[in-house]
Amino acid sequence: MNSIIKEHYFEHKSTIELARDILGMRLVHQTQHVKLSGYIVETEAYLGATDIAAHSYRNLKTKRTDIMYQPAGAIYMYQMHRQVLLNFITMKEGVPEAVLIRAIEPDEASIPYMEIKRNGKTGSELTNGPGKLTQALGLTIKDYGKTLFNSNIWLEEAKIPHIIEATNRIGVPNKGIATHYPLRFTVKGSRYISGQRKGQILTEIWQ
């Protein structure tokens, strides 16, 4: 059985380290009827007060971002256009940094249920984007404020990537130097990475 991630996992790690280290972990959502899960293959780090691309830049605090000031493991859901995005708070209370989950590889047993939630989408289209994966997992804005440690959403140790790549974050234009921060982390070769080209897909991506 995979080990469930507890509070101590986040201690003494930076947000960048966590964004890399959770690649390959199994993200689980226990719904009322079924357990849905997938393996994280793409993340982005957001570095709080000094990161102009972060919602908490300059320690901005609003009703929406209030959760970012909670301890590591808090779940920050927010809506962008018609999509809901999933983030985990990464640092101690009062330090508003987070990791955005951008893509997952569906657990095989979850695929039939995810296809229903994604209105018939199949293959990589199921979960190859931050709004797609939340829909596939059945996550909604109502999950805002939960934590990874005492709710129906959690992480488990699962797989180890062969290679992790770091590139610029997606959708961060006109943010000065922050536009070019290499804070997007991916499991090299995963077919589920957002915007992945067929020629970049590898058959062996896990150790």
Swiss-Prot record:
Q: Name one molecular function that GO assigns to this entry.
A: DNA binding
Q: What is its EC number?
A: 3.2.2.-
List the InterPro entries.
Formyl_transferase-like_C_sf (IPR011034), MPG (IPR003180), MPG_sf (IPR036995)
Claim: DNA damage is one of the keywords in the record = yes
Q: Per its UniProt entry, what is the enzyme's top EC class, as one word? A: hydrolase
- Keyword vocabulary terms for this entry: DNA damage, DNA repair, Hydrolase
Alphabetically, which GO biological process terms does the record hold? base-excision repair
Give the family from UniProt. Answer: Belongs to the DNA glycosylase MPG family.
* UniProt-recorded name of the protein: Putative 3-methyladenine DNA glycosylase
Taxonomic source organism: Listeria welshimeri serovar 6b (strain ATCC 35897 / DSM 20650 / CCUG 15529 / CIP 8149 / NCTC 11857 / SLCC 5334 / V8)
Output the lineage of the source organism.
Bacteria, Bacillati, Bacillota, Bacilli, Bacillales
